[in-house]
Amino acid sequence: MLMNLQFFSHHKGGGSTANGRDSAGRRLGAKRADGQTVKNGNILYRQRGTHIYPGVNVGRGGDDTLFAMADGVVRFERKGRDKRQVSVYPAK
């Protein structure tokens, strides 16, 4: 009588994969809402590239971050047909 026994207590490993990792989110997007009061230097919008363009009293940093250059109220506006901009107008 011939018996075919298989033992799995010392089975070889399953190898590795090229997947299995991910990077943390970069926390991009709007940091202040339309109509919100801001101070000089406040970050308004974090972005990669120019999704939104700087308007009145708004500067653009080296990483394309938009920030307030004066105290006032935030306004998200259309710029032409297919572009958007953010401006800061002095509070009355």
Curated annotation (Swiss-Prot):
**What does the record list as GO biological process?**
translation
Any Pfam family from its record, for instance, is Ribosomal_L27
Please provide the record's keywords in A-Z order: Ribonucleoprotein, Ribosomal protein
Entry-linked InterPro entries: Ribosomal_bL27, Ribosomal_bL27_CS
Gene3D superfamilies recorded for this chain? 2.40.50.100
Q: Identify the stretch(es) annotated as Disordered.
A: 11-30
Instruction: Spell out the GO cellular component terms annotated for this protein, sorted alphabetically and separated by semicolons.
Output: cytosolic large ribosomal subunit
Which residues are annotated as pro-peptide in the record?
1-8
Modifications the protein undergoes after translation, according to the UniProt entry = The N-terminus is cleaved by ribosomal processing cysteine protease Prp.
Q: One MF term from GO for this chain?
A: structural constituent of ribosome
Zinc: is it a keyword of this entry?
no
HAMAP family per the UniProt record, alphabetical: Ribosomal_bL27
Query: Which family is it part of?
Result: Belongs to the bacterial ribosomal protein bL27 family.
- PANTHER family associated with the record: LARGE RIBOSOMAL SUBUNIT PROTEIN BL27M (PTHR15893:SF0), RIBOSOMAL PROTEIN L27 (PTHR15893)
Protein's UniProt name: Large ribosomal subunit protein bL27
**Gene that produces this protein:** rpmA
